[in-house]
Amino acid sequence: MGATGAAEPLQSVLWVKQQRCAVSLEPARALLRWWRSPGPGAGAPGADACSVPVSEIIAVEETDVHGKHQGSGKWQKMEKPYAFTVHCVKRARRHRWKWAQVTFWCPEEQLCHLWLQTLREMLEKLTSRPKHLLVFINPFGGKGQGKRIYERKVAPLFTLASITTDIIVTEHANQAKETLYEINIDKYDGIVCVGGDGMFSEVLHGLIGRTQRSAGVDQNHPRAVLVPSSLRIGIIPAGSTDCVCYSTVGTSDAETSALHIVVGDSLAMDVSSVHHNSTLLRYSVSLLGYGFYGDIIKDSEKKRWLGLARYDFSGLKTFLSHHCYEGTVSFLPAQHTVGSPRDRKPCRAGCFVCRQSKQQLEEEQKKALYGLEAAEDVEEWQVVCGKFLAINATNMSCACRRSPRGLSPAAHLGDGSSDLILIRKCSRFNFLRFLIRHTNQQDQFDFTFVEVYRVKKFQFTSKHMEDEDSDLKEGGKKRFGHICSSHPSCCCTVSNSSWNCDGEVLHSPAIEVRVHCQLVRLFARGIEENPKPDSHS
């Protein structure tokens, strides 16, 4: 039995799964470790030593020894055994987390209580963990399993971690957004949405809008500096598309997401504002797509009766239609970023690129604050015009089950930029080659008809709408000249597409987009780099 001080390690010989083990708790490293120790004394930890960071312990409970089988074997040596159970995170394959339990048996009641008290005191110091959450459940999204998923996989973990909740099962579209505008959100430590990307978007818009209203910020002003919210958003995937969850956690698994919420993880994420004629249309965190992806989402809305199959049907129809759209894209390159769209360095937990880019962007903003001119008037805008099959802007990789690397594999979650991908008019065969590369390890940008830029602002004007939206075009002409390439004339009728904004249709072709660096925070930590499955045995 070991003694402990304020910051001294606690070490004892206990029993785990009928094996004699040395167990150590190191406050300085916030680490619980145990290893087999068959001989006298604790011994040194070997290769089979197990460990759990205190930050990944969910709860510690005194074990009901009468409910355990102790009538045979080595338990006979203990006249009155005592035990405590550590509930913790266990890493599984493919970035999944599992709820694991390890029970430690003690020969003395005093020793058992010492371990319980010490572990609980360390857990109390973890101030980033939520205590009270507001939960929105979409009972209709995906396969209609939202309520069942929450009750079976999430609620037990919240109860174990002593997290209290207020639950709202939504009955109509935009209910979550409207609720966040009306209620007192200061009493919560975070907002949890159970559903797909659509449900997350509702909560995102409600939280950002409520925060700006409280701060007196006009969201309709394209140059407005938006105020970040102090609340984090948790996503429990239960929808037809879970792109945001997959790109920030690495998997679409409800138990994994619930555990990230319980341990109080925090991940800052960029948000793009989309304006038209000084009116806010929407916010975007994943994909803004014009042309191919815009046509798919618009067509699929007419076929909701097909269920999830509508996306495949509309995708095939749009591919065969092979429409291209003429227009002008003007953008401000993201000079503050330390990466590039083709550097093959994906965003991972503790991302260096996001940290450095955030710091450099803050330095730029300070210089602009004390300078004579605004930074965007000093920096050089660029313009690309032509006929495009697709124009995509991604704030994240947009990875999902079908495309594990996403639309832009090296896009970063919190670097204050968006990857602008322009797909020029090409043959159906070449466009198919481009799409197929999203499902494998090949570089989807390695085509002559594909251009990709890392930007912090961009504007688009459709050729068909140039007369109506000439103010955007004329503003661009004063600052820069056009960069045009010679391409075969389009055989399609010149017309307008729609924008796919995180799965919602925007009917205005002319938009102005600005990236707001790390505007919101999620209960996530980013995708971990090659995590090894844990063995708490």
From Swiss-Prot:
Mutagenesis / variant outcome for changing residue 10 to A: 99% decrease in catalytic activity but no effect on substrate affinity
Its membrane topology: Peripheral membrane protein
Result for mutant: residue 340 to A: 15% decrease in catalytic activity and decreased stability
Root EC class: transferase
Cofactor: Ca(2+); Mg(2+)
Tissue specificity as recorded in UniProt: High level expression in heart, brain, skeletal muscle, kidney and liver; moderate in peripheral blood leukocytes and thymus; very low in spleen, small intestine, placenta and lung.
The DAGKc domain, residue ranges: 128-278
Protein keywords: ATP-binding, Calcium, Cell membrane, Cytoplasm, Kinase, Lipid metabolism, Magnesium, Membrane, Nucleotide-binding, Phosphoprotein, Transferase
Annotated active site: 197
Xref: InterPro entries: ATP-NAD_kinase_N, CERK_C, Diacylglycerol_kinase_cat_dom, Lipid_Phosphate_FormReg, NAD/diacylglycerol_kinase_sf
Gene name, Swiss-Prot/TrEMBL: CERK
Main location: cytoplasm
Species the sequence originates in: Homo sapiens
Region (Essential for enzyme activity): 1-115
Name used for this protein in its record: Ceramide kinase
Catalytic activity: an N-acylsphing-4-enine + ATP = an N-acylsphing-4-enine 1-phosphate + ADP + H(+); N-(hexanoyl)sphing-4-enine + ATP = N-hexanoylsphing-4-enine 1-phosphate + ADP + H(+); N-(acetyl)-sphing-4-enine + ATP = N-(acetyl)-sphing-4-enine-1-phosphate + ADP + H(+); N-hexadecanoylsphing-4-enine + ATP = N-(hexadecanoyl)-sphing-4-enine-1-phosphate + ADP + H(+)
Function: Catalyzes specifically the phosphorylation of ceramide to form ceramide 1-phosphate. Acts efficiently on natural and analog ceramides (C6, C8, C16 ceramides, and C8-dihydroceramide), to a lesser extent on C2-ceramide and C6-dihydroceramide, but not on other lipids, such as various sphingosines. Shows a greater preference for D-erythro isomer of ceramides. Binds phosphoinositides.
Activity regulation details: Inhibited by sulfatide. Inhibited by sphinganine, sphingenine, and N,N-Dimethylsphingosine (DMS). Cardiolipin at 0.1 uM significantly increases activity, whereas at concentrations >1 uM has an inhibitory effect.
Activity-pH dependence: Optimum pH is 6.0-7.8.
Entry EC number(s): 2.7.1.138
Keyword Lipid metabolism: yes
Record keyword Cell membrane present: yes
GO annotation, biological process: ceramide metabolic process; glycosphingolipid biosynthetic process
